[in-house]
Amino acid sequence: MRHLYILLFILLFSVPVSASYILIPMDAESQTEHLKAYGITYWTLEKQLKVKWLLNYRGGSFLLPDTEEIKKECQIRGISFEVLSNSKTEEILNLISSPSQNMEAVVLEKAPRIAVYSPKGSQPWDDAVTMVLTYAEIPYTVIYDEEVLADQLLLFDWLHLHHEDFTGQYGKFYRAYRAAPWYIKNKKEAEAMAVKSGYSKVSQLKLAVSLKIRDYVVGGGFMFAMCSATDSFDIALAAEGVDICEAMFDEDPSEAGYQSKINYNNTFAFKDFILERSPMVYEFSSIDMTSKRKIIKEIDYFTLMDYSAKWDPIPTMLVQNHTSLIKGFMGQTTSYAREQVKASVLIMGEQKTNGEARYIHGIKGKGFFTFYGGHDPEDYQHRVGDAKTELELHPSSPGYRLILNNVLFPAAKKKKQKT
């Protein structure tokens, strides 16, 4: 009988402890599919399971429940993962919670509903956000002017804007592309939409859309914009009630002395900018640094700021990466003149040599906005008509990771910021 008890004791304590969590590491050494890792995190949230985002732990790793379904899905998508025991999980969480560590575990509660503001037809340029959402297998809904004016933004938690022009100047493409079929088509469609919506000018339509987006953010929504959507949005708000469009855009001259009538109090991020008056110049204002940059491609990088994960979890979430040095990339709006960024706005990524802000974040009312300069993080100088980037060649792109940080940010359990 004594031998039987000994045998039972050995069997009982030799059974392996069942794992309770799956760790998706996000450091440079362990993960080969950083972008798809965001997709599996979103997919887990869709299953109504909670996830912990381990800020500053191994590149901003994710802690998921241990289920066979999640492990199988990780294998299908080629995502590296580690199965953790209860004791190992507790050890990691204790490390993260230590006051001596600049780390934090943030709970992600639900999959955010994502809207992408984009014309329904194809455009002669790519959209970095729709490409990375598709690659990461994160679902989104395309909406445009008609849906925004019908208050359908209220159905979504997160709104993306990319290569857009909210000023009614058709992207300032007049000089180079006014005879191009796509330009003529886009102009006619915009004019028809303006009339259908009850406006006599496209600039009036775009202002109405901008005001709806502003109200969406003020009411608690999250807006993420890239490239020309960033500065043209603020310009449209600042120029409310002022005609800044020349005759080739709206069939009448611009308003005399319009620069003096610009109201910087209306903007989200920018101040004291000077508008580009010439319709022949591919530029909206002095906000953008594209033509003023003095740096060559080979050394064009920007640096992510470092924040206290425990005291400032929001910007910490938005800068999670496996490197703090990000390759620069250009766009119609590449970066922002630091002196024209409002003091209330956080500069999360900067190119110090040129005095450029590349990646900025702010609060508006109950909501948040992030502006990210440049067009495509893996195409240094994307031009009209260029082939789209194949993200299969860049599965761990640090520049694209910043976009996906913003996608998951609305999923975080809201906790009052301490600073």
Per-segment meaning from a language model:
Residues 127, 134, 231, 250, ...:
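Catalytic beta-strand/loop cores that center a nucleophilic Ser/Cys/Thr
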Residues 14-16:
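N-terminal signal peptide c-region/cleavage motif recognized by signal peptidases
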Residues 1-4:
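Positively charged n-region of N-terminal signal peptides that target proteins for export
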Residues 19-127, 136, 374, 416:
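Hydrophobic targeting/anchoring helices
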Residues 22-32, 62-72, 122-230, 234-239:
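Helical hinge/lid and interdomain linker segments adjacent to catalytic or ligand-binding clefts
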Residues 20-26, 32-63, 243, 341-419:
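Extracellular ligand-binding/catalytic regions of CAZymes and related secreted enzymes
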Residues 183-184, 198-199, 206, 218, ...:
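Catalytic cores of eukaryotic secretory-pathway lumenal/extracellular enzymes that build
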Residues 107-110, 151-154, 216, 363-365:
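Extracellular/periplasmic catalytic domains that process cell-envelope and extracellular macromolecules
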